[in-house]
A protein has these predicted regions:
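Midchain, well-structured core segments that form catalytic/ion-binding scaffolds
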Residues: 145-280, 289, 294
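Active-site metal-coordination/substrate-binding segment of hydrolases
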Residues: 63-131, 360
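Generic non-transmembrane alpha-helical segments
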Residues: 9-12, 16, 29, 33-37, ...
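N-terminal helical capping/dimerization or prosegment-like subdomains
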Residues: 1-77, 249-253, 360-362
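Acidic/histidine-rich catalytic neighborhood of metal-dependent amide-processing enzymes
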Residues: 105-175, 179, 379
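An extended, acidic, His-containing surface patch that forms the Zn2+-binding/catalytic region
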Residues: 224, 287-379
Length: 379
């Protein structure tokens, strides 16, 4: 495939506005492209207009199965007038292709698809199966990753590469993430007679104080050598009706980034114990809800998959971790374990930013590197 066509494919999928939805249009485009080159795909519907894409091909004797995965959704562009170049125009300036999803992660997804096409048409021998898993809803809960895992689509994998941006680093571990809500129920009263009511904001403040103390203690006591410490932040709070009334309803939301050494179930139990303790007070009525629960993940940094990748470079690539989550948080819940790594084009600090871009030489190089990795792993 010519260089210009590889770039044009990336431009086409960036121009599809798959903002927290509409992934079906991306899936249909990629499925048609793959079928044009003899690779048959399957659309797996999540909801109306939202389709995952599974595609695979095999060569030689039935050997190992190597998965390639990327998500098709992107986050909102924000204030589009703040962009130097329109976020869905996919303009090229110098060596940079600009657009929402250029780095996170349509360049990684396109590179994987093109690598499969070129490898199939090259006739180069290998033994095994290459399997694409293009997912919906990664940005808002790894929805497609969860769906495909529960449906058994990763049960045959021996290894998996997720093409999120890592800029020539190998991400083998990342933090988990928990979003929670605490609702405080109380009793309204006039602000001149606070003893006639139950001030729910004071109650939330007490929860924040206790939660911060417990989480700070946890962070100081347990640390992961790569990921660091557990991170806790209360990020949203709302309540009250007017300034001269004691509020009867308020709520807060918080986010926790977890590490393998103190997993999510223990953190959730800790939050529950704080709420239970406070609710022993006669005027307290706190209600805890876990809104989002993604586990931390860790792969073997000395796995055959990582060795195959390292062999494609003259200098060893750094092994890293990240605070952000990926579809690995769902895929690794499969009934069997498999090697995985996050490795794709783009700078890790650019996702969700204004003027997001990918370096074209990085994108084009990853197409070649993915092919070399496949041939090595499935030799």
């Amino acid at each position: 495939m010519k260089k210009e066509e590889k770039i044009a494919i990336l431009q086409e999928i960036i121009r599809i506005k798959s903002v927290n939805g509409n992934e079906g249009e991306v899936a249909a485009y990629l499925n048609k492209l793959l079928e044009k080159h003899g690779i048959i795909g399957e659309l797996v519907s999540y909801s109306n207009g939202r389709d995952n894409l599974i595609a695979q091909f095999q060569k030689g004797q039935s050997g190992k199965v190597l998965g390639l995965s990327g998500h098709m959704d992107v986050v909102a562009a924000g204030n589009e007038s703040s962009w130097t170049y329109a976020p869905f125009a996919a303009e090229i300036h110098g060596n940079r292709l600009y657009g929402r999803g250029a780095t996170d992660m349509k360049s990684g997804l396109a590179a994987m698809v093109i690598a499969m096409i070129e490898l199939k048409e090259s006739g180069k021998p290998f033994n095994g199966t290459v399997k694409l898993l293009a997912t919906v809803g990664e940005e808002v809960g790894e929805l497609g990753g969860e769906q495909l895992t529960k449906a058994g689509y990763v049960d045959d994998l021996d290894a998996l590469i997720i093409g999120e941006p890592t800029n020539y680093s190998l991400m083998y571990t990342h933090m988990g993430s928990i979003n929670y809500t605490v609702i405080s129920h109380g009793k309204e009263a006039h602000s001149s007679m606070p003893d006639q009511g139950y001030n729910v904001i004071n109650h939330l403040n007490e929860f924040i104080t206790k939660a911060n103390a417990e989480m700070n203690h946890l962070a100081e006591a347990i640390e992961n050598p790569v990921l660091g410490k557990t991170i806790h932040n209360v990020t949203l709070i709302s309540g009250g009706n007017q300034v001269n009334s004691i509020p009867s309803h308020a709520q807060l939301q918080g986010n926790i980034r977890s590490i393998p050494e103190y997993p999510n179930d223990k953190i959730i139990a800790l939050l529950q114990s704080i709420v239970k303790e406070l609710n022993q007070e006669t005027d307290y009525h706190l209600e805890l809800t876990i809104d989002y629960n993604k586990i931390p993940v860790k792969a073997d940094p000395d796995s055959p998959l990582i060795h195959c990748i390292q062999q494609q470079f003259s200098q060893p690539l750094p092994l890293v971790g990240a605070a952000a989550t990926t579809d690995a948080a769902e895929f690794t819940k499969a009934d069997h374990s498999f090697d995985f790594v996050v490795f794709g084009p783009g700078v890790v600090t650019l996702p969700h930013q204004i003027d997001e871009y990918v370096e074209l030489d990085n994108y084009l190089d990853m197409i070649e590197k993915y092919q070399a990795i496949i041939l090595s792993y499935l030799a």
